């Protein structure tokens, strides 16, 4: 939010001496992601294999995800995971992102609290989603995968993965929830600009999509439907894997670069947060900013 008001010359002079944006140099981009599961005294219960009803193993995920990503997903022992140099090189295009002191918001609220926000919108695609998209595309490329699939709702994740797929020379198929496909043509254009094939979901290109359209011809789509189509395509296409933009542990792992940078920037500001707040959908944004701070508790 932006707040505007009048001020006097003395206030302007006072403002000129205060720092609003705390910027880290490229050399301070973290070299490791933080895996909070390793530090949890009570480990999360493992998901169950839907076929065997037994605890899921990393190898159960290999047919769907790149092996390195499946291993990260199930890793509950290593607190720190190295960030490959090729990923850090891509991060340098927009990281470290600024930490900003929200003086105007503090004034508008009349609060004595010091409010800071981590501005992930400076990434080439305008969101934090690129932090994991770059990592996932890299690990797929390293495994020799040539094609990847995904779903997207409003298009933020699809745009991020399109950028990353282009950077690492991968072919990408995106199933975009139909209502968003129709309402957000510019987001679709961004994906197509980076070379992605974008299909409105449900579609006639998969069994899952055809079944839904047969039963509900006017259905406007959902993330669940788009996921079903993306996984089906990945499973039926040679040398192809599925990627996901939130919810899973390895996605949140990649997003911890946000909080790790913010820690250093708060030190630059000479403060430490009492409360960390983040928007929460699938959880990768909130986990990314909060997990590095939570490890100290």
Q: What feature does the model see in each segment?
A:
Residues 11-297:
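PLP-dependent amino-acid enzyme catalytic core
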């Amino acid at each position: 939010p932006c707040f505007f008001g009048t001020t006097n010359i003395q206030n302007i002079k006072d403002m000129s001496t205060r720092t609003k944006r705390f910027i880290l140099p490229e050399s301070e981009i973290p070299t490791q992601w933080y895996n909070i599961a390793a530090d949890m005294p009570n480990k999360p219960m493992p998901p169950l294999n839907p076929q065997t009803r037994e605890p899921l193993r990393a190898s159960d995920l290999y047919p769907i995800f790149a092996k390195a990503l499946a291993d990260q997903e199930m890793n509950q022992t290593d607190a720190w995971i190295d960030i490959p140099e090729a990923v850090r090189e891509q991060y340098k295009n927009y990281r470290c992102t600024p930490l900003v002191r929200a003086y105007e918001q503090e004034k508008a609220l009349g609060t004595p609290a010091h409010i800071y926000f981590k501005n992930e919108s400076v990434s080439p695609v305008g969101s934090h989603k690129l932090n994991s998209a770059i990592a996932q595309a890299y690990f797929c490329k390293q495994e020799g995968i040539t094609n990847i699939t995904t779903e997207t709702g409003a298009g933020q994740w699809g745009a991020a993965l399109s950028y990353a797929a282009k950077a690492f020379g991968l072919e990408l198929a995106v199933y975009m929830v139909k209502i968003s496909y129709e309402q957000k043509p510019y987001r679709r254009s961004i994906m197509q600009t980076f070379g992605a094939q974008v299909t409105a979901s449900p579609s006639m290109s998969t069994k899952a999509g055809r079944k839904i359209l047969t039963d509900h011809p006017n259905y406007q789509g959902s993330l669940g439907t788009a996921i079903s189509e993306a996984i089906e395509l990945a499973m039926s296409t040679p040398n192809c894997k599925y990627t996901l933009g939130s919810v899973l542990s390895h996605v949140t792992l990649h997003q911890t670069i946000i909080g790790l940078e913010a820690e250093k920037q708060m030190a630059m500001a000479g403060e430490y947060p009492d409360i960390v707040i983040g928007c929460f959908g699938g959880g990768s944004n909130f986990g990314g900013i909060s997990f590095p701070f939570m490890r100290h508790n």
